[in-house]
Every structure is written in C-alpha cells, then in structure tokens.
Amino acid sequence: MKLNDLSPAPGSRREKHRPGRGIGSGLGKTGGRGHKGQTSRSGGTIAPGFEGGQQPLHRRLPKFGFVSLKAMDRAEVRLSELAKVEGDIVTVQSLKDANVINQNVQRVKIMLSGEVTRAVTIKGIAATKGARAAIEAAGGKFEE
C-alpha cells in the first residue's frame, strides 16, 4: 500500500453540492437562487448596508467623537523598554533607532511600568513622578 492508494471509507465523505447540475441533485435549474429578481441574476447583489430604500442604520445614528491628531505624534514608553536603547543617553531619536517608538513620534513620556536595569541619562523626554523617582533611584538623571 502506498500513499496514492489511500482513499476514504465508502460513505464516510459526502460529495460537495454542484448547483445547476440536474434535477436529481436538488439544486438543478435555478441552482438554489429562486426564480426571478435581482439576486437570481448573475452579478445581482445589493450593496452592503443597503436596506431596501429604508434609511440605513449608519445614517440613522448620530456622528460622535473625533480622532485626535495629538495621538499621532505622541507616545508612552515603559521603564522596562529603556533597556532596549544602546548607550547611557536616552533621547527621542535613540528610542526611534531602537524601534521602541514610531518614526513620526515627536514627544515621549516615560511611564512607571517595569524596572530600570541600569543608570541612564534622559534628555528631552518627560516622565511621570513615579518613573522619575525610579530612574533617579537607579542612579540615572534628567537633562532638559
């Protein structure tokens, strides 16, 4: 016996439906599409969200909120992510080089999450009170 001789046991697998292939299949003639109408035609589909002329749900509900443009150029960095930066000086550019933040980020804030493993000098980056205390306790310092 070889792999090409293997076949499933008789009756264990059902044949797939082939619409429009004879009356005996149960899906002959109209192929399960019903009789006349838009959806019986080839290419006959309605647009997603179309509700037959009734005001669609996405137009019945009010608009709300907006996308803050500030969120696009600001980022938060955890204390544990500072270890990914090579060298002892951490700047916005060094965080970008270490792929910690996106290239379009301009302002960064360090959050108290994780631990500082070494003493680092932070230049031009804001930090929360807890993060500032943790960095200074590890022997690091802040420069504006």
Curated annotation (Swiss-Prot):
Region ranges (Disordered) = 1-57
**GO terms under biological process:** translation
- Database matches in InterPro entries: Ribosomal_uL15, Ribosomal_uL15/eL18, Ribosomal_uL15/eL18_sf, Ribosomal_uL15_bac-type, Ribosomal_uL15_CS
Keywords recorded for this protein, A-Z: Ribonucleoprotein, Ribosomal protein, RNA-binding, rRNA-binding
Query: What Pfam families does the annotation carry?
Result: Ribosomal_L27A (PF00828)
Recall the GO molecular function terms of this protein's record.
rRNA binding; structural constituent of ribosome
For the keyword Ribonucleoprotein, the answer is yes
Q: Name one GO cellular component term.
A: cytosolic large ribosomal subunit
Keyword RNA-binding tagged = yes
Family listed: Belongs to the universal ribosomal protein uL15 family.
| Protein role | Binds to the 23S rRNA.
UniProt subunit comment? Part of the 50S ribosomal subunit.
What is the designated name of this protein? Large ribosomal subunit protein uL15
Q: Which organism is it from?
A: Pseudomonas fluorescens (strain ATCC BAA-477 / NRRL B-23932 / Pf-5)
